[in-house]
């Protein structure tokens, strides 16, 4: 069967938000518009619902055609001037895996804890500067108890406060500020933290599309030292959601003191008592500031100024506007996918299959967005069938470049 027809069927499913390929093929049998689009006249049999899955296993599984389709649609959005390419919003959403949360095996996983070697070097430089012996950092082995699904072993057990627990996949999505075009959607297990793939995916969109990233709006889950360093080094105006550290008592205690950068001291606001840095810094990069009798201690990270920079960003007028738009863009994108494009549940097992399906869903969502935005700005309206027709031309071009899928 012609692969163009197969992908047409998949996009009919994605654009109409149909729950399954079986339901899609049933509608194709009786819908004149679908038959016209597929080039199948009445009286001729339509493809069986299992046709695409069989072709996927034999022809498309190991190809990169799904990503190429997604990238080509983003490039079409850039061509229509619907992508700004400077301001982005990133977040993740969970998709329920096709797995029973009560059927799992408990496993112990060992891994080497990831080290920040750049931070270790800076800490040791500070210790040498103070005439102290540098620390010897070693690899630490971590052991974790995890739940592994008996049904879908590649899914991850997701548990967060005020969220449903169970086996999930995470979609780490990035959208552009101008017209909410999805520029990246990366699938991981449900037990992967939001911040882990962020830097790699930011580099991906930068090099894939040639974007000059100037601003990023993210929630507090991305407030890590590595991401702050990435924003500083790349001159990106980053806005993080507010995050509370420590206990209310400890925060109240530290707020009693004011830091003087020129003298590198803390002083108590009420009494004027001074806390000085005496060259003590721990393995995590926290410097100790003490009074003369060592009864009062305040810790300050070696890169505390980064926290101050991003706090100023968050409280600035520009930062408040940027963070307000975050939920109007990336959260809206997730809601649209789940409500209108059948994205609420993972219909496939395994990270790879879900990634391929996600590329197609996001490509369909972008196609719909392109049609609506072109209509809204007063240009010649692009009907959905017109978008699909243009997509077929793109698809044929991609398939010709990917002859390996025919083997």
In which residue ranges do the predicted regions lie?
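Basic, short loop/linker segments at the boundary and entry of helix-turn-helix/winged-helix-like folds
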Residues: 1-11
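Short amphipathic alpha-helical interface patches used for protein-protein assembly/oligomerization
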Residues: 34-38
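Short, aromatic/basic-rich helix-turn unit that serves as a nucleic-acid recognition element
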Residues: 14
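Anion-binding and metal-coordination hotspots
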Residues: 17-30, 40-407
